[in-house]
Amino acid sequence: MVAERADVLPALSEVFREHGYEGASLALIGQRTGLGKGSLYHFFPGGKEEMAAAVLAEIDSWFEQHIFRPLREEDPRRAVPGMVRSVDGYFRSGCRVCLVGAFALGDVRDRFADAIRGYFAAWTDALAQGLERGGLAEDAARDRAEEAVAAIQGALVLARALDEPGSFHRAMARIEARLTAP
C-alpha cells in the first residue's frame, strides 16, 4: 500500500526506464503504481514533470550515498572497487537502463538539464577526487574519471543492445583495472 510519496518512486522509476518520459502516460503510471489520477496529483501536484524530477532526485540521492560520497571520502583503494560493485548492482549487471542517461539523450534533456548535468558532473568530480587522492595527477585523474563514466554508460548501452550482461561485467572489470592502475 502506498502511504507516502516516496513509496511511489520505485514504480515511477521503472515506468520511466521502460517507456521514457513521453511514453509514460498517466494511465500507465496509475496502472503500475496502483494509484488513481487524484492520488498521483496529491503526491505530485506538478504532474508527470514533478514525478520525473522526484525520480531523478531519488537517483541522485542513491548515487550520492553509495558512490559519490565514498569516492570523495574513503580510501580510493576501497572506494573505486566499491563503486564498480555498486554500479554493477544498481544497473543489474547492465540489464537496467540508466534513466539519467536516457533522459540526457531524449527530447526531455532541456527540461531536466540541471539534474542531468549535476548527476554526471558529481560522478566525474567524485571519481576524479578519489583518483587524485590515490596519487594521480589532477589532469590524469580527471581524464580517467571522464573516461570511466563514459565507458560505464557505453557498457550499459552495449549490454542492453546485445542482451548480454556478460559484456557489462567484462567492461566493468576493465574499467576497474584502468582506474586502479598506477
Residues of each region from the PLM?
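Hydrophobic alpha-helical connector segments
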Residues: 67-96, 145-148
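Amphipathic alpha-helical segments used for helix-helix packing
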Residues: 52, 79-82, 91-114
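Helix-turn-helix
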Residues: 7, 11-54
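N-terminal intrinsically disordered/low-complexity leader segments
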Residues: 1-3
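Amphipathic C-terminal alpha-helical segment
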Residues: 89-90, 105, 149-167, 180-182
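Amphipathic alpha-helical interaction segments
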Residues: 78, 82, 102, 143-150, ...
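Amphipathic alpha-helical packing segments from all-alpha helical-bundle domains
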Residues: 64, 109-135, 143-146, 170-180
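Short, basic, alpha-helical segments at the C-terminal edge of helix-turn-helix-like DNA-binding modules
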Residues: 56-62
